Amino acid sequence: MEKKLFLVDVGEEISTRILIPENPLCMYVFAHGAGAGIDHDFIITVQKTLFKKGIATFTFNFVYKEKGKKLPTSKKLVDEEYKAVWKYVLKEFNNYSLFAGGKSMGGRVSTRVIDDLSEIKGLIFLGFPIHSPGRPDKFVGAYIKNIRTPMLFLQGSKDPLSYKEITEKIVAELHNAQLYWLEGGKHSWETTKKNPKNQMQLINEACDQIVAFCKCYYKG
């Protein structure tokens, strides 16, 4: 189901897409990455795959993307929008166990506003940007070391924003985090023709990990 949602707290209208299977295990609220909105094939495919596996999803456009802009102009704005969406979800879907997160930037935003995501069971990242592209020395988000909410990092092994050595070191230092490598996948888990698995297979593999993670924490 696609619908427009007016965010009272920010005074803007955004597009959302909600997929709810019969008797879902939980609901995963996730935001898109910086460069592409909820109509991107990656977001749509993840939603449809999770639907088939029994997990409800709620995804949404940030306002800048809704207005056709390429990139966000302010961290504060996207943070406030994520919090406003969560407030709406808590009101309308309070019968579900709720998980949050997102693709790349969307996942990072969820970590910045974690203190405002009440009733959250866990964070799920679809390719978390651990460092600047090709710059493992430029770690972004040291604050995530303070998060105690369970976290699942789903990272492509060929992601230029998530080199293996630094990613494994950082995740190992977190309070309650799991790391799963999608072998051969780049930032959106796309692969080369030589890779044993294609992007669709890696998305399916990642969604299996999401289901397993949610089963561990949806009652917590």
Q: Which residues does each PLM region occupy?
A:
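The conserved beta1-alpha1 loop
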Residues: V29-G33, G127, Q155
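Acidic beta-to-alpha connecting loop that harbors the catalytic carboxylate
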Residues: A34, S157-D159, G184-K186
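Short beta-strand/loop motif that positions the catalytic acidic residue
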Residues: I147-R148, F153-Q155, D159
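Conserved alpha/beta-hydrolase "acid-adjacent" motif
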Residues: P160-I166
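Catalytic histidine neighborhood in serine/cysteine hydrolases
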Residues: E173-T191
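Catalytic active-site module of serine/aspartate enzymes centered on a nucleophile-bearing elbow/loop
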Residues: G185, K193-G220
